[in-house]
Design a protein with these regions (language model features):
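Short secondary-structure capping/junction motifs at helix and strand boundaries
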Residues: 2-6, 33-37, 118-120
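An N-terminal domain-cap segment
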Residues: 1-20
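Core nucleotidyl-transferase/polymerase catalytic module
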Residues: 19, 31-32
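Acyl-donor binding region in acyl/amide transferases
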Residues: 46-204
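Catalytic micro-motifs at enzyme active sites that drive phosphoryl/nucleotidyl and oxygen chemistry
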Residues: 10-15, 26, 63-69
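A short helix-loop-beta-strand connector motif used in the catalytic cores of GNAT acetyltransferases and
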Residues: 16-25, 48-49
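Residues that flank catalytic or metal-binding motifs in active/ligand-binding sites
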Residues: 20-22, 36, 75
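Conserved beta-strand in the GNAT
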Residues: 25, 32-42
Length: 204
């Protein structure tokens, strides 16, 4: 999808630091193939720097409230660098791609079974600049309306600006129920020749 560095080995300081990030790998034992994966770190394993800031792969993007650090982080897994191997991506017509994301979620579910204290997943999701800007604005508005962080637990250092007229979006997403607004979002994004990104759908 265009993510990562494009290098044959995509390793950074978070992979080699003391108590580094771990890898969740989804394996197809019949074909002996890697299906996909995530990089993750348990909140209980997060260390703080000299200024008291968490050493996280997302720390350059977000400011974390004390409430989040004390009450949520110990019960959280930070996720990042998700991928589905090309042969298993949903754009492929064969059956391989149909259940790839489901298998990935099964892997995340397995983590919560192994670590029953975990209640939350946290991380960033990439939407590329090539994605239709109006479509992106509609998705952002919809997510802020129905899943907004009212307690300011995690705040972006550089918030994404919605360029589409706010009143227009308010009139478009005028329903009180999530499902009704979602139907509008899906219809409008498709009318632009786009699809809602799979991870956006999955995380909702």
């Amino acid at each position: 999808a265009g993510g990562g560095t494009g290098k044959s080995m995509d390793i950074d300081e978070y992979d080699v630091m003391p108590n580094p990030y771990k890898q969740l790998v989804v394996w197809n034992p019949e074909a002996e193939e890697i299906l996909g994966g995530y990089r993750y770190l348990l909140g209980t394993d997060v260390r703080m720097d000299e200024q008291g800031h968490p050493i996280l792969a997302t720390a350059h993007m977000f400011d974390f409230s004390q409430n989040f650090l004390k009450e949520y982080l110990p019960q959280t897994i930070e996720l990042g660098r998700s991928f589905v191997t090309l042969e298993y991506q949903s754009t492929r017509s064969d059956a391989k791609g149909i259940f790839a994301l489901d298998n990935l979620w099964d892997g995340l579910g397995a983590l919560t079974v192994l670590m029953p204290n975990v209640k939350y997943f946290f991380g960033k999701m990439t939407m590329y600049p090539s994605y239709n800007r109006r479509g992106r604005d509609m998705i952002l508005y919809f997510l802020n309306k129905h899943f907004g962080d009212k307690d300011k637990l995690v705040v972006p250092k550089e918030p994404l600006l919605i360029e589409t007229d706010k009143e227009e979006l308010e009139n478009l997403f005028c329903e009180s129920e999530f499902k009704a607004d979602y139907r509008i979002l899906n219809r409008e994004v498709r009318s632009l020749g786009c699809n809602i990104p799979p991870l956006v759908n999955a995380y909702m």
